[in-house]
């Protein structure tokens, strides 16, 4: 009997989480669409978790800063990292040696860590240096769960469609910390409300 109640609890909980993420995806102002070579990835941004980070991402999207930026670090089974708008633009000034070390001209952001959300497949988090208050423009999309990141990196969204396309992003060499030779890119990034 208790096992049945526990199972029912988890079914209800899963439904609430799905409904919560779907509700964010239904908000065009907080829906980011990334065009990849094989199609579009839709991300529900989470201003409820990270209002400053989401605001900065949306500004960079609207400034077209993310267009043509490489997925410079991609580790199979872990994550795909992009967003280095200083050194990662494949059409303007791509620097294979420096990509991953740059950000935007906007200020770095104070950490907005969540204890309620966890790093799992499809979660989008902000990359940073050792300083927890150093996130700027780079972000990553998770291929699978990574509990060590929970409460250590700011969560900014969830992939709501197109995760199969994220899975196809060219992977890097694990021996080289996922550095990708001839990387895939974000062709275009937009906020759904701006169509």
Q: Positions of the model-derived regions?
A:
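Cyclophilin-like peptidyl-prolyl cis-trans isomerases
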Residues: 2-3, 9, 13, 20-195
């Amino acid at each position: 009997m208790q096992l049945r109640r526990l199972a029912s609890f988890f079914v209800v909980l899963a439904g609430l989480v799905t409904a919560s993420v779907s509700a964010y995806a239904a908000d065009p102002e907080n829906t980011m669409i990334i065009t990849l070579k094989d199609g579009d990835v839709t991300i529900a941004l989470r201003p409820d978790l990270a209002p400053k980070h989401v605001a900065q991402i949306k500004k960079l999207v609207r400034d077209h800063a993310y267009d043509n930026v490489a997925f410079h670090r991609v580790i199979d089974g872990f994550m795909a990292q992009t967003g280095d708008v200083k050194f990662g633009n494949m059409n303007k000034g791509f620097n294979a040696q420096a990509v991953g070390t740059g950000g935007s001209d906007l200020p770095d952001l104070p950490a907005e860590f969540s204890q309620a959300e966890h790093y799992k497949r499809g979660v989008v988090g902000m990359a940073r240096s050792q300083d927890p208050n150093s996130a700027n423009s780079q972000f990553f999309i998770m291929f699978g769960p990574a509990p060590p990141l929970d409460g250590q990196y700011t969560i900014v969204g969830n992939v709501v469609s197109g995760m199969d396309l994220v899975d196809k992003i060219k992977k890097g060499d694990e021996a080289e910390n996922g550095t990708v030779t001839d990387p895939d890119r974000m062709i275009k990034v937009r906020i759904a409300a701006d169509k």
